[in-house]
Amino acid sequence: MASKSQHNAPKVKSPNGKAGSQGQWGRAWEVDWFSLASIIFLLLFAPFIVYYFIMACDQYSCSLTAPALDIATGHASLADIWAKTPPVTAKAAQLYALWVSFQVLLYSWLPDFCHRFLPGYVGGVQEGAITPAGVVNKYEVNGLQAWLITHILWFVNAYLLSWFSPTIIFDNWIPLLWCANILGYAVSTFAMIKGYLFPTSAEDCKFTGNFFYNYMMGIEFNPRIGKWFDFKLFFNGRPGIVAWTLINLSFAAKQQELYGHVTNSMILVNVLQAIYVLDFFWNETWYLKTIDICHDHFGWYLGWGDCVWLPYLYTLQGLYLVYHPVQLSTPNALGILLLGLVGYYIFRMTNHQKDLFRRTDGRCLIWGKKPKAIECSYTSADGLKHHSKLLVSGFWGVARHFNYTGDLMGSLAYCLACGGGHLLPYFYIIYMTILLTHRCLRDEHRCANKYGRDWERYTAAVPYRLLPGIF
């Protein structure tokens, strides 16, 4: 448990980026040239990357090379491809507006009741981690409830009342893409303006002096409207992750409509990804203590990424299987299922061990033994000194980010379910490997700055990051 002492408030950096003294914890104040170049590249090309993948499925049966070859050989032009792309429609705009409004309603106006009758589930009003400025925010954790209500209404309306077709998401997939982009850019722009003009917590704002970096990575740490509507928690969990399983169900329904059956590969993708989604919402309180909430500021990276990148690229396996139905042999299907379940077990148990250690302040058993830890201290931006412990027992003694290793095993299982016919469904494992490796290195850089020599003692005790004996 953290204790506090030695209050000495530092100066805060001004919006024009001029220097002032800073705390030892939080996102970097200065921007190096590589980070800036990477950010400008993503701002320019990430929307195009999403469009290219979705267009390749719609017009080229999920081939990533065919569009480029058509353009290179003169068989098609960019104008030809764009002309075949469905535009935004009034129906898609209405669907998307209704969807987002419904999720806002569930998030903001319906207090959680699941924690009252589900044993082991922690919901309702919960505290987040302490921010770099020393603030502890409160959250209404009701994601599981929102997921359950949404999916019950989906099945009732689509299959019992027949108010809409269960293929409605697939049938409007590209028009919905334009709506998601509009929301992503709108909320990111609003968050930046809010950070300058009326931030929720000015002490947790960071200005680098670079417009592109501020827009991409965000200024405010926890932008809010009112007491409870937290931008970061809402957009991280809703509407993208609630939609994830609905999108997959719509893809499965389309496969049924086109071919008269649903393949075992589509079932595998739906089941394995649903486990991940349900795990996220079951452990939403734990999520309040992860890097997304505890370190990232809210900018385009989270705002646009959660609206567009996540729902469109994380569901590529289901989309691919609509165009290329794959029926796996029973041994292959069981092997992929086992890989996904083992990966999930490692991911969940690794996180559970850390959560158990934190909740009990180390007074627990991990793998039948009293856990070992490295004692650390750090100073927040308000000048207060805090103490914490870094776990070196259980899976956390195997590698410093073994939860990421389990996550990558599950990600690989999603992709393997699609067979080896095309590269497109394997984008997810490639992307997740890059993302989690970068996150691993970024987290370690942050922890090195935060804990100093204590971090060196920790890395000596647990020398490997992701793969024991290798990396």
UniProtKB/Swiss-Prot annotation:
The gene is Dhcr7. It is found in: Endoplasmic reticulum membrane. It comes from Mus musculus. Pathway: Steroid biosynthesis; cholesterol biosynthesis. One of its GO terms (molecular function) is NADP binding. GO terms for cellular component: endoplasmic reticulum membrane. Its main location: endoplasmic reticulum. It catalyses: cholesterol + NADP(+) = 7-dehydrocholesterol + NADPH + H(+); 7-dehydrodesmosterol + NADPH + H(+) = desmosterol + NADP(+); 5,6alpha-epoxy-5alpha-cholestan-3beta-ol + H2O = 5alpha-cholestane-3beta,5,6beta-triol; 5,6beta-epoxy-5beta-cholestan-3beta-ol + H2O = 5alpha-cholestane-3beta,5,6beta-triol. NADP(+) binds at K354, R358, L391, W396, N403, Y404, D443, C447, A448, N449, K450, Y451, Y458. The keyword Heme does not apply. Disruption phenotype: Deficient mice die within one day of birth due to respiratory and suckling problems. They exhibit abnormal cholesterol homeostasis with reduced tissue cholesterol levels and total sterol levels, enlarged bladders and sometimes cleft palate. Belongs to the ERG4/ERG24 family. It is a multi-pass membrane protein. This is 7-dehydrocholesterol reductase. The modification Phosphoserine is found at S14. Residues 1-23 are annotated as: Disordered. Coiled coil: none annotated. Its EC number is 1.3.1.21, 3.3.2.11. Interacts with DHCR24; this interaction regulates DHCR7 activity. Interacts with TMEM147. PANTHER family: 7-DEHYDROCHOLESTEROL REDUCTASE, DELTA(14)-STEROL REDUCTASE. InterPro entries: ERG24_DHCR-like, Sterol_reductase_CS. One of its GO terms (biological process) is regulation of cell population proliferation. The chain crosses the membrane at residues 36-56, 95-115, 144-164, 173-193, 233-253, 262-282, 302-322, 327-347, 416-436. Keywords: Cholesterol biosynthesis, Cholesterol metabolism, Endoplasmic reticulum, Hydrolase, Lipid biosynthesis, Lipid metabolism, Membrane, NADP, Oxidoreductase, Phosphoprotein, Steroid biosynthesis, Steroid metabolism, Sterol biosynthesis, Sterol metabolism, Transmembrane, Transmembrane helix. Oxidoreductase that catalyzes the last step of the cholesterol synthesis pathway, which transforms cholesta-5,7-dien-3beta-ol (7-dehydrocholesterol,7-DHC) into cholesterol by reducing the C7-C8 double bond of its sterol core. Can also metabolize cholesta-5,7,24-trien-3beta-ol (7-dehydrodemosterol, 7-DHD) to desmosterol, which is then metabolized by the Delta(24)-sterol reductase (DHCR24) to cholesterol.
